[in-house]
Amino acid sequence: RDELPNVLSLALGSYGLSPLENASYFAVFANGGRSIQPFFINKILKNGEEIEFLEKKEIVENLIESWVGKKFPKKESFTIDPRVSYIINDILLEATRRGTGKKIQSLNRDDFAGKTGTTNDAESTWFTGFNKNILTTVWFGYDQPASLGNNEFGSSTALPIWLNYMEEIIDDIEYGIQPRPSGLIAKKINLI
């Protein structure tokens, strides 16, 4: 919190997060209010044998923390109240049902929540999608900020990449919706 600017536009995304930070913060919602230690995929095998991709950087326990410059809490710690996590998770589920993340419906699963993002002038876009068993963030942009072009958004750039990845692994991901914590009451409100 100390490194975030104290400005009202922060809620609209005025502060740029790295993909790792984005995944770390969204993981709190995927884990019922608990913070987790994020990690990178460093190797992908085809048919269990041929290496399709191999991350060249050595992955060690504190490498991620050294890149980001701060410690991440261990899984046991609650960052936010589980009831708050559930409500935000429910809102993000709606974003994948009727909002900018609705392309997720092509997976024929109703347990994935997510959020698209687009910076000013479309210099970078992202999508973070998750259920309680997996969370993945895709960032799309240039190393040196430059516009991606007109009409480029998280839903048209990062989300399709995320979907392509998920289509390959979806059958191996267990269905997972957060259980409703005690202490929450659902009421239908209709002012029309």
Please identify what each model-predicted range represents.
Residues 1-24:
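Mid-domain, small-residue-enriched loop/turn segments at the edges of structured enzyme/sensor domains
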